[in-house]
Amino acid sequence: LYQPSYISLESALSFHGIITGFPYTVTSVTPRKTRAYLISGKEYGYTHLSPKWFWGYEKKEAFLMAGPEKAILDYLYLAFKGLRPAAIDEFDLSTIDRDMLKDYLGKMADQRFLRFTQRLKL
């Protein structure tokens, strides 16, 4: 609907089994402006994410979706910016590749965000 974008945040976290339930809104990130659409009773939300962090996704059928580690970091980055609650105590992190998560954190190269994730004991 709104390109370029990939499914991430709550929708990807739910898909990967990191959170329970499925959000009402299909949540995606985009390097473009934040937008929302209501189509046939379904809400699609697109949240701006810096173009330099527009990676870590893969093709799933006809759409792009963040891998589990990138979905966590996308969500936490928005929490860091005050746009989401930092409620990772509700996340099931048992299947997460911790080495990949650390690599991705290094790739994001934002020291304030890194300190934020360290305080969360990610």
Task: Describe the residue ranges of each PLM region.
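Nucleic-acid-binding surface
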Residues: 1-122
